[in-house]
């Protein structure tokens, strides 16, 4: 079957619209998940006039997530200026502009046809493709047999740095799959499965000739490649310790771009025992900014900080030591006067900036919003992907005063939908610790009206936060008549390291008190009906749900998604052996700690009707513990149900499964919560 070509549409295309009355508004439905599109990967053109971005759609007919590349003018503040660049069927990602602005490149796995670059099995592999802005069909720049994992343009536009995974030395002749031979300490990863010993290395690709030169090698992986401004060097991230599986000790390294065959070995810039990542060069090429974790022994509870290191060598300088908040995605301003970065704080994700000497911290983009990505234009304009309580992610610009929206991807859908009211609240926990959360109420709910059936929804992590980001699930529950309470309990990020670390080796205690305090606040406020309560979550949200229903019978229904209840059973079964050992110790030495924390050992206390869900190839939080919880509850005669999604890892991907999960959420809560007990 012929495939539609990928074509750059002419920039002279025009649109017209006929003024119409706004459609009557209706409540949000499950099917709106497939009407709403996800915007991501904003990339500013070198001339600062355009932003390219990826729009992703969940397609129920094909049961796949599909993506398209779009472009919008940055001087536009109205709908209608955005231009689609790719036809369906390619799902591009990682868009990048060539330095001269002539090409817009992206990663894609093209189906069979010209440029497919299949491997020895005949399967197409991911390659770098390029669109010429002057028009014409996209063409593949690379033809790497094993595919390309990541890439970046050199400053002169003549080369690309590619991240490419090794290939097996000998092909497998058997008709059945090759046996998995395990020798590594870390031998599983969610989304991948069993790990082999193949590694990902860096190559320099010359665009004009197609020449490919390997510049790193060895028994370790390289990632996050970043060209120096003069194009002579490439910074990257790698864990080159004696056993990278036994730690998270990634460092920042620099290698010469012409280091063919390892002739010029990489040079190590950082020696921190924790993770160092996300390198970004200063405009003069003398320094590299990066994200660092200086307390590896407390794993993901540690605060991620901003640091700066001289390329010539010397001790790094921590720029945000006193900030006590997680940061990310650092980028130098074009003139080198400031470093911009993402900043997580109290249910917001702002965009902040700081001087290279660590002074003058400001937050240009802040407020009730969640900024998840940004790029800086040549004229100083900040171009950001921003979500708000009533706006799924869209691209905005900031020129020094206020945010201005430049994409309107979902406006036509949202115009016909009544959304929930969202309120940020603060309340005391049992020990008087102030806790924050968000309460969603149905669109037609009036203050002072009768209390509502209410759902406590718990976030994953545990080190993450509910924010002002558009929350489809909470909006859906509110559209079906529920109040929804979302809490940032201790263990969450956004409130400092001590707040996150408060649940270290103590899950289900302080965080239990905090989420229950959120429910009690909603009851005191007249929002929640204490006789009609439900609880649930996914990942750590499911884990804490299990603790909740062991400790209380206040909830009429529970949904435990991708959860753990018998922690010792997961050692060596999930992909967290390093984290388990750090937090709880080796299970044969500290078994009492493992058993004390596991809700399974008090499973007889559970009387709440419980829906248990998970994916059958989830190696993050394997379905095994869900099966054990289900088996125990069925043996005890409790009301329960187990739903297993075939072929799914930790985050469900198939649109049909996403739809099914939402429908089961609603059906379970409607069955047990809406009728007073």
Which residue ranges define each predicted feature?
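Mature N-terminal segment immediately following signal peptide/propeptide cleavage
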Residues: 22-63, 67, 71
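Residue-level detector of Asp-centered blade-edge/turn motifs that repeat once per structural unit
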Residues: 46-47, 99-100, 155-156, 229-230, ...
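Hydrophobic beta-strand positions that form the internal "hydrophobic ladder"
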Residues: 48-51, 101-105, 157-160, 234-235, ...
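A flexible loop/linker signature enriched in serine peptidases of the S9 family
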Residues: 55-68, 85-93, 105-129, 137, ...
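Short loop/turn segments that connect beta-strands within beta-propeller blades
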Residues: 74-77, 132-136, 206-210, 256-261, ...
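Cap/lid segment of the alpha/beta-hydrolase catalytic domain
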Residues: 241-242, 295-296, 401, 409-531, ...
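Active-site-proximal cap/loop segments of hydrolase catalytic domains
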Residues: 479, 486-677
